[in-house]
Amino acid sequence: MEDKMKIDTEGILDKAAARRLFVAVVITSFIGPFAGSGINVAIPALGQEFGASAGELSWVVFGFLLGSAMFILPTGKLADIYGRRRVYTIGLWLFASTFLLGACATSVAMLNVLRFLQGCVMSLIFGPGMALLVSSHEASQRGRIIGYSAASTYSGLSMGPVICGFLCEYLSWRSIFLVTGLVVLISIYLLKDIKQEWYGDKGASIDKKGSICYLVAAPLWLCGLSKITDGSTGFLLLGAGAVGLLLFWWIESKAEHPCLDVRLFHGNPVFTFSNLAAMLHYSSTFALSFLMSLYLQVIVGYTASMAGMIILLQPVVMAALSPKAGALSDRIQPGLVASVGMTMTAAGLWGMSFLTGDTPIWIVGLLLMWIGLGFALFSSPNNNAIMGAVEKKHYGTASSLLATMRLMGQSTSMAVVTMIIALCQVHSLTGEDNVQLLGAIQIAFRIFGCISIAAIFMSLVRNKAK
């Protein structure tokens, strides 16, 4: 069986093995973000069962994000050294175990510890995940498979709250953890006969100084973003995080086997500007579903289920078209396709900034579908451009860096919304502050529109430089 699973020294798998690996990674690409975003709807049920405070419950969400952000960059290098499949498989086992244990949590403290651990072990999956896909398939298929992976990730992020809402309402919040753990076991089964291994820097030593510096700097930055409305505390944490990240960059520039090889950015504008465009894209779009949920439920008056169905228009279009956009980027310059997608997304976000309580729902639906199309045209081709801009030995680092850009962008997006809601003095979501809330939503979309214009600039500069 082992001999049938690999065909050459380049690591390209035969069709049967490649299909199994592809399905395993796509399943995991869905279920990780699905669990990460879906648990949000279970917060009230958790509070009721455990009698937990709002502060304790906030760590159910933030702990997961913190664990992911801390380890996702170092694990990419770890996978390059010890083997991408090996690290990925270990991550799957740990991910399944921590979620199955989460279903048995007896206190909010136990759950918070498990959520942090879930975030940590998810980095073992998302760090080498895309590198594993790209390493095992021919270069001519790279855009297509990245498209399916991106579609799966976005679908998980968007559909998590909807599906988990039903699980929580009709079964229990524990079923979310149970279902997630069991689904991950499917990926483990699909990978069990694949023995081929992929390395990027086999036998290299681990960059301890750089890794420790990043493990300290990343959470400081994220904590600063989460406390941006707390005045000096938030800005002090942000400043400390920024200094730490600059120190991390300096350490990496001197290291023999760096956690992040900063030389990848030197003379490589496609890689540099594609990563910056990715971070700005996530910064401008991640809060979309949150803002639209507030708009549709509080401003317009739809039920939660109806609002969820309307919001699903965006990820459905995105998931349906991402593979086609990825395949298109195999034939046309990826940066060009991504630039068109980012321009469409920017136009859609600016359109959202003009929404009022009387806007016809069909216009809202069209805007969501338009943004979904922009998502598809940007995400997969941009990821393709990033992975195509580095040598095979750097696939693990590139994959982890892209995941880091996603997490940083997501955190920034929610920090912007939190700050705007506070500045607009939105104190109630029961209808009393609808004027202020609508104003905050409009301002947020205008800011995100400006951020997306910056992303267009990064994308165009990349194309010109190339």
Which residues does each predicted region cover?
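12-transmembrane solute porter fold
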Residues: R19-F34, I39-V41, A54, S152, ...
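Helix-loop-helix hairpins in multi-pass membrane proteins, especially solute transporters
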Residues: G76, D80-K209
